[in-house]
Swiss-Prot record:
Tissue: Expressed in cerebral cortex and cerebellum. Expressed in retina (at protein level).
Post-translational modification: N-glycosylated. O-glycosylated; contains chondroitin sulfate glycans. Part-time proteoglycan, expressed in part as a proteoglycan exhibiting chondroitin sulfate glycans and in part as a non-proteoglycan form. The relative amount of both forms depends on tissues and tissue maturation.
Residues with attached carbohydrate: 38, 57, 76, 123, 132, 143-144, 153, 156, 160, 162, 198, 240, 318, 322, 372
UniProt cross-references to InterPro entries, sorted A to Z: CSPG5_S_attach_dom, Neural_ProG_Cyt
Superkingdom field: Eukaryota
Encoding gene, per UniProt annotation: Cspg5
Any one of the GO BP annotations: regulation of synaptic vesicle exocytosis
Subcellular location: Cell membrane; Synaptic cell membrane; Endoplasmic reticulum membrane; Golgi apparatus membrane
Name of the molecule in the record: Chondroitin sulfate proteoglycan 5
Function per UniProt: May function as a growth and differentiation factor involved in neuritogenesis. May induce ERBB3 activation.
Amino acid sequence: MGRAGGGGPGWGPPPVLLLLGVTLVLTAGAVPAREAGSAIEAEELVRSGLAWESRANDTREEAGLPAAGEDETSWTERGSELAAVGPGVGPEETLEASAAVTGTAWLEADGTGLGGVTAEAGSGDAQTLPATLQAPDEALGSSTMPPAIPEATEASGPPSPTLRDKPSLVPELPKEIPLEVWLNLGGSTPDPQRPEPTFPLQGTLETQPASDIIDIDYFEGLDSEGRGTDMGRFPGSPGTSENHPDTEGETPSWSLLDLYDDFTPFDESDFYPTTSFYDDLEEEEEEEEDKDAVGGGDLEDESDLLLPSQKPGVGPGTGQPTSRWHAVPPQHTLGMVPGGSISLRPRPGDPGKDLATSENGTECRVGFVRHNGSCRSVCDLFPSYCHNGGQCYLVENIGAFCRCNTQDYIWHKGMRCESIITDFQVMCVAVGSAALVLLLLFMMTVFFAKKLYLLKTENTKLRRTNKFRTPSELHNDNFSLSTIAEGSHPNVRKLCDTPCVSSPHARALAHCDNIVCQDDPSAPHKIQEALKSRLKEEESFNIQNSMSPKLEGGKGDQDDLEVNCLQNNLT
C-alpha cells in the first residue's frame, strides 16, 4: 500500500492476494463447494476484500488522473480477480465478496435466511429455498455486481496466468444470475412478525379445512329421480310409494309413528261419569286396532287421504301441519277411522249406506263439513263444539247434537250447552217468586181492608145524623126510605123498638108495626101502601074533626099526635 501511495503507475494488487485467489480457484475447481455453514472462510474473504478495496481507492485518489490504459489495467486486474474468484469460490463467498464491494449488508452464513439453502458451485441449479424471499425485482435492483462483471471482462488486457491455465467462467456468470438473485433473496432479513407460508411439494394433495360446500351427490336427482324427490314431501305423502316401494308389502316403521304420534286416545276422566253406554264402543275400537295391526298395507292409502302433499320447496319442518287429531267423545253410531273422517255407522237394523258418494260430491251430509277435500264431522274438527263438558253426537237428518252435562244443583241448557244454571240461581228464582206472591197477597188485603173501613165510616156518620134530626126533617126527607130500600135495616129495627104514644088506633099501629118489624123483603112496599090507605082515612077523619065543636079540640090534638107518631114509625 506504501508503493501505491508513492504514485508508481501500473502497480497491481499485492502478491499475497493473488496467491490467495489462485489457491481458492484451484480448490474450487477440484473440491465441491462448501456448505452454507462455513462462515469463517467467508469472513476472511470479506476482510481481505475490504482491505484491497481501501488500498485501491487510496491509490486512485493519490495518483490523480492516471492514463486510460493504466486505469483499464487496474480495473482489469480487479475484474480478473473477481472473475477468478467467482467460479472457484462457493456462491456464499461470492455474495459476501460482492457485498463488500457494493456495501450491501448480508447476514452470516449460519443465519435463518440461509439455513435451508444447499447449492453446488457453478452448477446453477437452485434447490428448495425458504419462503422469506423478496420479490425478484427488488433483488435485481439491490445487486449491482452482475452488470459490472461483463464490463470488466470486455475491458481486460492481457489475461492473467490463472486465465491462461484454466478458461474463465466470467461469461457464464450472467447465466447464474437467478441463483445469485435467489441467494440474495435468501440473505434478506425475514420479518419476525409475519408468518411464513408453506409451499407444498408438487404431486401431493393438501388437506383443506371443512367448508359449507356439500357434495353434489347428496342432491342427485332433485328433479324426478333419486332420493331428492322425497326431500320436499312429508313422509307418507303421495309419491313416496313410487320411489320407495315397500319390500314385503308392509309399511315402514316411520309411517306408523308419524301417523299415530299425535293421536290422543279417548280418556273417560275428561268427561262426566255417564259412561254406561261406552262398553260397546270400546269393543269396536279394539276390533279396529286389530284390523289396523293386521292390514298394515292399507295404511298407506289412508295416509294419502290424511296427509296431502305439500309444495316441493317446503319441508316437513317448515310447512303447516296438514291435519290434526282430536279426542272425540265416542258414541254408538260413530265410527272412527284413523286415516279418514268420523262418519255415521249404520245401525244394526238399518241398511248400509255408502258415504263415498257424499264425500266425493260437492256437498256433505248434515253435520259434516268439507276439510282438505274430504267431509269431516263437526265434532271431529271442533272438539269444543259443546261447551261446559257437553258431549257432541251426530244424529241423522239433524246434525251435531250436544248432550249437556248434569250434576247436582247444576244444569246446562242451550243448543251448545252455553248456558249454566247453578243452585244459587235456582234459589234466587224461588225466593223471588215467593216474594212476588206475598206482595200480591198483601196488596189485596190492603185494598179490601180500606174498602171495609170506608163503609164502616159511612155507617157511623149516618147514625150520628139520625140522632139529631127533628120529626119534621124526617118527614120531609126521604133519606130514611132510601136507606130502607138499600137494605139497611138497623134503623128500621130501632124505630120498631121505640114505643109510640097509645092511641085509639092501636090496632092499626100494631098492624103497621108488624109489617115494618118483619124481615120480609117486600116490607117497604107494604108499608108504603099501608101509609097511603091510612092517609086517606086520616084525611076523612080530619075533616070530621074540623066540623066538630071546640070542646072536642083536645081530643083532636091528641089524634094528630098519634098520626104523627105513626108517620115517624113508618119513616
